[in-house]
Protein backbone atom coordinates (compact mmCIF):
# COMPACT_ATOMS: atom_id res chain seq x y z
CA UNK A 1 0.00 0.00 0.00
CA UNK A 2 1.24 3.49 -0.88
CA UNK A 3 1.68 5.92 1.99
CA UNK A 4 -0.80 8.82 1.97
CA UNK A 5 0.19 11.66 -0.35
CA UNK A 6 -0.41 15.39 -0.73
CA UNK A 7 -1.34 16.33 -4.30
CA UNK A 8 -1.76 19.93 -5.48
CA UNK A 9 -3.46 21.31 -8.58
CA UNK A 10 -2.17 24.70 -9.75
CA UNK A 11 -2.97 27.13 -12.54
CA UNK A 12 -4.51 30.44 -13.52
CA UNK A 13 -8.20 31.30 -13.36
CA UNK A 14 -10.08 29.25 -15.94
CA UNK A 15 -7.43 26.52 -16.09
CA UNK A 16 -9.87 23.90 -14.82
CA UNK A 17 -8.44 23.24 -11.35
CA UNK A 18 -11.75 22.29 -9.73
CA UNK A 19 -12.49 19.76 -12.45
CA UNK A 20 -8.95 18.41 -12.19
CA UNK A 21 -9.23 17.93 -8.42
CA UNK A 22 -12.40 15.88 -8.85
CA UNK A 23 -10.80 13.96 -11.70
CA UNK A 24 -7.73 13.05 -9.63
CA UNK A 25 -9.91 11.97 -6.71
CA UNK A 26 -11.88 9.67 -9.02
CA UNK A 27 -8.71 8.16 -10.49
CA UNK A 28 -7.31 7.46 -7.03
CA UNK A 29 -10.52 5.75 -5.92
CA UNK A 30 -10.54 3.67 -9.11
CA UNK A 31 -7.08 2.49 -8.07
CA UNK A 32 -8.21 1.39 -4.62
CA UNK A 33 -7.19 4.58 -2.81
CA UNK A 34 -10.46 5.26 -1.04
CA UNK A 35 -9.54 7.74 1.70
CA UNK A 36 -9.18 11.00 -0.22
CA UNK A 37 -10.29 14.52 0.71
CA UNK A 38 -10.45 17.69 -1.37
CA UNK A 39 -9.48 21.11 -0.01
CA UNK A 40 -9.07 24.55 -1.51
CA UNK A 41 -6.73 27.45 -0.82
CA UNK A 42 -7.53 29.81 0.62
CA UNK A 43 -10.31 28.08 2.51
CA UNK A 44 -11.57 24.70 3.78
CA UNK A 45 -11.55 25.61 7.49
CA UNK A 46 -13.94 28.07 9.19
CA UNK A 47 -11.15 30.60 9.75
CA UNK A 48 -9.59 30.12 6.32
CA UNK A 49 -12.98 30.53 4.61
CA UNK A 50 -13.46 33.89 6.33
CA UNK A 51 -10.02 34.93 5.12
CA UNK A 52 -10.98 33.76 1.62
CA UNK A 53 -14.00 36.06 1.60
CA UNK A 54 -11.83 38.93 2.81
CA UNK A 55 -9.27 38.34 0.04
CA UNK A 56 -11.71 37.79 -2.81
CA UNK A 57 -14.43 40.34 -2.00
CA UNK A 58 -14.21 43.16 -4.55
CA UNK A 59 -16.46 45.64 -2.75
CA UNK A 60 -13.90 47.11 -0.34
CA UNK A 61 -13.21 50.84 -0.63
CA UNK A 62 -9.64 50.29 0.57
CA UNK A 63 -7.09 48.64 -1.73
CA UNK A 64 -4.99 45.78 -0.38
CA UNK A 65 -1.28 46.33 -0.04
CA UNK A 66 0.49 43.48 -1.84
CA UNK A 67 2.17 42.39 1.40
CA UNK A 68 -1.23 42.32 3.12
CA UNK A 69 -2.56 39.98 0.44
CA UNK A 70 0.47 37.69 0.80
CA UNK A 71 0.16 37.50 4.58
CA UNK A 72 -3.57 36.80 4.40
CA UNK A 73 -2.92 33.99 1.92
CA UNK A 74 -0.38 32.46 4.26
CA UNK A 75 -2.59 32.89 7.30
CA UNK A 76 -5.27 30.82 5.55
CA UNK A 77 -2.69 28.32 4.28
CA UNK A 78 -1.15 27.76 7.70
CA UNK A 79 -4.59 27.23 9.24
CA UNK A 80 -5.50 24.65 6.59
CA UNK A 81 -2.19 22.79 6.73
CA UNK A 82 -2.14 22.59 10.53
CA UNK A 83 -5.83 21.87 11.07
CA UNK A 84 -6.72 19.66 8.11
CA UNK A 85 -3.94 18.58 5.75
CA UNK A 86 -1.23 17.35 8.12
CA UNK A 87 -3.66 15.55 10.49
CA UNK A 88 -5.30 13.83 7.50
CA UNK A 89 -1.97 12.66 6.09
CA UNK A 90 -0.96 11.27 9.48
CA UNK A 91 -4.18 9.23 9.56
CA UNK A 92 -3.47 7.76 6.13
CA UNK A 93 -5.85 9.99 4.17
CA UNK A 94 -4.74 11.40 0.84
CA UNK A 95 -5.24 15.13 0.29
CA UNK A 96 -5.87 16.93 -3.00
CA UNK A 97 -5.59 20.70 -2.79
CA UNK A 98 -6.81 23.34 -5.21
CA UNK A 99 -3.68 25.55 -4.92
CA UNK A 100 -0.80 25.68 -2.44
CA UNK A 101 2.32 27.80 -1.97
CA UNK A 102 3.27 27.80 -5.67
CA UNK A 103 0.27 30.10 -6.11
CA UNK A 104 1.86 32.69 -3.83
CA UNK A 105 5.12 32.58 -5.79
CA UNK A 106 3.14 33.08 -9.01
CA UNK A 107 0.42 35.54 -7.95
CA UNK A 108 1.96 37.61 -5.17
CA UNK A 109 5.49 37.06 -6.47
CA UNK A 110 5.21 37.21 -10.25
CA UNK A 111 1.94 39.13 -10.48
CA UNK A 112 2.41 41.66 -7.68
CA UNK A 113 6.19 41.79 -7.65
CA UNK A 114 7.02 40.57 -4.14
CA UNK A 115 10.51 39.10 -4.05
CA UNK A 116 10.77 35.31 -4.17
CA UNK A 117 13.26 35.36 -1.30
CA UNK A 118 10.73 37.04 1.00
CA UNK A 119 7.96 34.59 0.08
CA UNK A 120 10.24 31.61 0.68
CA UNK A 121 11.26 33.00 4.07
CA UNK A 122 7.61 33.23 5.04
CA UNK A 123 7.00 29.69 3.83
CA UNK A 124 9.90 28.12 5.72
CA UNK A 125 9.20 30.14 8.85
CA UNK A 126 5.78 28.54 9.31
CA UNK A 127 5.64 25.42 7.12
CA UNK A 128 9.30 24.39 7.22
CA UNK A 129 9.90 21.57 4.71
CA UNK A 130 6.24 20.62 4.23
CA UNK A 131 5.84 20.28 0.46
CA UNK A 132 3.46 18.48 -1.92
CA UNK A 133 4.31 14.97 -3.10
CA UNK A 134 3.03 15.92 -6.53
CA UNK A 135 1.90 19.14 -8.18
CA UNK A 136 -0.03 19.25 -11.45
CA UNK A 137 0.25 22.63 -13.12
CA UNK A 138 -2.51 23.31 -15.64
CA UNK A 139 -1.00 25.75 -18.11
CA UNK A 140 -3.50 28.01 -19.82
CA UNK A 141 -3.01 31.22 -21.78
CA UNK A 142 -4.39 34.14 -19.70
CA UNK A 143 -6.68 35.22 -22.55
CA UNK A 144 -8.30 31.78 -22.65
CA UNK A 145 -8.46 31.37 -18.88
CA UNK A 146 -10.06 34.76 -18.30
CA UNK A 147 -12.60 34.15 -21.06
CA UNK A 148 -13.62 30.91 -19.34
CA UNK A 149 -13.74 32.61 -15.93
CA UNK A 150 -15.89 35.45 -17.29
CA UNK A 151 -18.66 32.94 -18.05
CA UNK A 152 -19.21 32.52 -14.32
CA UNK A 153 -21.87 34.58 -12.56
CA UNK A 154 -19.43 36.70 -10.58
CA UNK A 155 -15.75 37.62 -10.88
CA UNK A 156 -13.88 38.15 -7.61
CA UNK A 157 -11.31 40.81 -6.75
CA UNK A 158 -8.37 38.86 -8.13
CA UNK A 159 -10.17 37.74 -11.30
CA UNK A 160 -10.84 41.41 -12.09
CA UNK A 161 -7.14 42.14 -12.43
CA UNK A 162 -5.54 43.11 -15.72
CA UNK A 163 -4.37 40.79 -18.47
CA UNK A 164 -0.84 42.04 -17.80
CA UNK A 165 -1.07 40.80 -14.20
CA UNK A 166 -2.05 37.31 -15.35
CA UNK A 167 0.67 37.25 -18.01
CA UNK A 168 3.23 38.00 -15.29
CA UNK A 169 1.66 35.36 -13.06
CA UNK A 170 1.84 32.73 -15.80
CA UNK A 171 5.45 33.65 -16.56
CA UNK A 172 6.27 33.13 -12.89
CA UNK A 173 4.54 29.74 -12.90
CA UNK A 174 6.54 28.65 -15.94
CA UNK A 175 9.78 29.80 -14.34
CA UNK A 176 9.11 28.14 -10.99
CA UNK A 177 7.96 24.76 -12.31
CA UNK A 178 11.39 24.30 -13.89
CA UNK A 179 12.89 24.31 -10.39
CA UNK A 180 10.85 21.39 -9.05
CA UNK A 181 10.90 17.88 -10.52
CA UNK A 182 7.70 17.03 -8.62
CA UNK A 183 5.67 19.38 -10.82
CA UNK A 184 3.95 18.04 -13.94
CA UNK A 185 2.88 20.55 -16.58
CA UNK A 186 -0.29 19.85 -18.57
CA UNK A 187 -1.60 21.92 -21.48
CA UNK A 188 -4.98 23.18 -20.27
CA UNK A 189 -5.76 25.14 -23.44
CA UNK A 190 -7.03 21.95 -25.07
CA UNK A 191 -10.49 20.36 -25.04
CA UNK A 192 -11.53 19.29 -21.55
CA UNK A 193 -11.73 15.62 -22.58
CA UNK A 194 -8.13 15.68 -23.79
CA UNK A 195 -6.97 17.50 -20.65
CA UNK A 196 -8.80 15.00 -18.46
CA UNK A 197 -7.18 12.06 -20.27
CA UNK A 198 -3.74 13.66 -19.97
CA UNK A 199 -4.27 14.14 -16.23
CA UNK A 200 -5.31 10.50 -15.90
CA UNK A 201 -2.25 9.31 -17.83
CA UNK A 202 0.10 11.32 -15.63
CA UNK A 203 -1.52 10.21 -12.37
CA UNK A 204 -1.44 6.54 -13.37
CA UNK A 205 2.21 6.83 -14.42
CA UNK A 206 3.05 8.51 -11.11
CA UNK A 207 1.17 5.87 -9.10
CA UNK A 208 3.09 3.11 -10.87
CA UNK A 209 6.36 4.76 -9.91
CA UNK A 210 5.23 4.95 -6.28
CA UNK A 211 4.30 1.26 -6.23
CA UNK A 212 7.67 0.29 -7.68
From Swiss-Prot:
SUPFAM superfamilies assigned: P-loop containing nucleoside triphosphate hydrolases
GO cellular component terms listed in the entry, alphabetical order:
cytosol
Name the PROSITE patterns on file.
THYMIDYLATE_KINASE
Where do the coiled-coil regions begin and end? Answer: none
Q: Which reaction does it catalyse?
A: dTMP + ATP = dTDP + ADP
GO molecular function terms listed in the Swiss-Prot or TrEMBL record? ATP binding; dTMP kinase activity
Q: Which residues bind ATP?
A: 11-18
Gene that produces this protein: tmk
Q: Which UniProt keywords apply?
A: ATP-binding, Kinase, Nucleotide biosynthesis, Nucleotide-binding, Transferase
Pfam families in alphabetical order: Thymidylate_kin
InterPro entries cross-referenced by the UniProt entry: P-loop_NTPase, Thymidylate_kin-like_dom, Thymidylate_kin_CS, Thymidylate_kinase
Top-level taxonomy: Bacteria, Pseudomonadati, Pseudomonadota, Gammaproteobacteria, Enterobacterales
What is the top EC class of this enzyme, as a single word? Answer: transferase
Briefly state the protein's biological role.
Answer: Phosphorylation of dTMP to form dTDP in both de novo and salvage pathways of dTTP synthesis.
Q: What is this protein called?
A: Thymidylate kinase
The EC code for this enzyme is 2.7.4.9
Q: Name one GO biological process term.
A: dTTP biosynthetic process
The family note in this entry says: Belongs to the thymidylate kinase family.
Amino acid sequence: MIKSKFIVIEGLEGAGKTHACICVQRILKENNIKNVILVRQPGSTPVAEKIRKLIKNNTYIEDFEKETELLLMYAARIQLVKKIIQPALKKGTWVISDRHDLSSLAYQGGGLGIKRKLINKLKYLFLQDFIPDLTIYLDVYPEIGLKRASKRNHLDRIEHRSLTFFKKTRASYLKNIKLDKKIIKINANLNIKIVTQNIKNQILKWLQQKVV
